[in-house]
A protein has these predicted regions:
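Ligand-binding loop in jelly-roll beta-barrel domains
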Residues: 89-109
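Short, conserved beta-strand element in jelly-roll/cupin
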Residues: 43-45, 56-70
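A short, N-terminal "cap"/entry segment at the start of jelly-roll beta-barrel domains
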Residues: 1-36, 71
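Conserved short histidine dyad/triad with adjacent acidic residue
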Residues: 24-25, 38-55
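Short acidic-glycine-tyrosine-enriched beta hairpin
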Residues: 74-89
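A cytosolic small-molecule/anion-sensing beta-strand core signal
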Residues: 64-65, 80-81, 99
């Protein structure tokens, strides 16, 4: 099983500072990826989105900065800094940057 990557170990860090918002883009930085879990930082410019898709695992998304809109099964949720939501495995979900927005989804397979 692989551990964390793309982040300094045994050091205090700010997760939201580990990924930068870029104009007109969704930027991602994978921190861990294996058969059991996926941990990836995302940064959305205002108005950018990840269209509806499904995941094979439950995903807990935590808003690190800004305001994001999460749609799960046609229900819209708004996340502010510090808020979290669990998107159930197999259910369609999408993410939209209501404002410039950073999130940390942790997917457990």
């Amino acid at each position: 099983m692989n551990g964390f990557k793309n982040v300094e170990k045994a050091a205090v860090l700010s997760l939201r500072e580990q990924v930068a918002i870029q104009e007109g883009q969704v930027v991602s930085r994978t921190l861990a990826q294996n058969d059991a879990v996926s941990v990836t930082l995302f940064a959305f410019d205002k108005g950018e989105e990840i269209s509806s898709h499904r995941s094979g695992g439950d995903a807990m998304v935590t808003c690190l900065e800004g305001v994001g809109r999460i749609t799960v099964d046609d229900t819209v949720y708004t996340l502010h800094e510090g808020d979290s939501i669990v998107m159930p495995a197999g259910h369609p979900h999408a993410v939209f940057g209501e404002e410039r927005f950073k999130m940390l989804p942790v997917v457990v397979f």
